């Protein structure tokens, strides 16, 4: 808090690196206090249904923790779940326990059929693709395009989800030990594997094991990533 205003922030990979399918893990710990809001989430680089104007083009909340809750919340937000109100068939959110004040691993395993959410390697929630015949209208599964990763720590307020802010909990922070991303060796496409890898990628930084070219975990951009104000 500075000059009577709350300052929050985060980082993202928008226009730097997108994720589509595979396994994504973030090892992080964060401060929990009344009014705090830690989040690890994904938004689409581009809409899967660009011709349709709706409020929710797709969102995958790998982890959200608010105030003094001792659970990590997982959610998906789509036109189907929010605009149309189908939030229980199938359920759009779930919960997992985490170790407060310690590093925990929050992840997803994402395929064309479902998204499985995990905490410390344990499955805590999953969301399936229903393959609706009118999918382009219902938009239950806008998850077949690349998404970018967002890590941020916000605070609430009287009308916000975390509720009133207790200034005694400040300053608050999120600390990230690593981000790891894995892809299946055979993704079922015609990619010949000759795609040029940008020079500003960190490949397998700090890991002792040797991985096949292009298959290293934790491949992410090394350039500065600024949170949009």
Segments (PLM) and residue ranges:
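GH16 jelly-roll
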Residues: 1-193
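Extracellular and organelle-lumenal recognition/adhesion modules and their flexible linkers in secreted
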Residues: 193-229
């Amino acid at each position: 808090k500075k000059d009577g205003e709350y300052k929050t922030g985060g980082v993202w990979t928008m226009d730097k690196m997108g994720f589509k399918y595979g396994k994504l893990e973030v090892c992080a710990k964060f401060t929990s206090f009344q009014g705090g809001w830690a989040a690890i989430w994904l938004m689409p680089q581009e809409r899967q249904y660009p011709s349709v104007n709706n409020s929710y083009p797709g969102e995958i909340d790998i982890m959200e923790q608010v105030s003094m809750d001792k659970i990590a919340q997982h959610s998906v937000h789509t036109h189907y779940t929010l605009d149309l109100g189908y939030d229980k068939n199938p359920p759009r959110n779930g919960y997992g326990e985490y170790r407060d004040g310690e590093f925990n691993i929050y992840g997803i395993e994402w395929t064309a059929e479902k998204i499985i959410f995990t905490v410390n390697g344990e499955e805590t929630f999953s969301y399936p693709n229903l393959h609706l015949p009118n999918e382009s209208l219902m938009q239950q599964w806008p998850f077949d395009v690349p998404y970018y990763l967002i890590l941020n720590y916000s605070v609430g307020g009287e009308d916000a989800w975390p509720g009133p802010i207790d200034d005694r909990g400040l300053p608050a922070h999120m600390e990230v030990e690593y981000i790891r991303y894995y892809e299946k060796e055979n993704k079922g496409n015609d990619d010949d594997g000759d795609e040029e890898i940008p020079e500003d990628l960190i490949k397998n930084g700090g890991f002792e094991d040797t991985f096949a070219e292009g298959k290293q975990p934790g491949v992410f951009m090394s350039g500065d990533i600024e949170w949009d104000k």
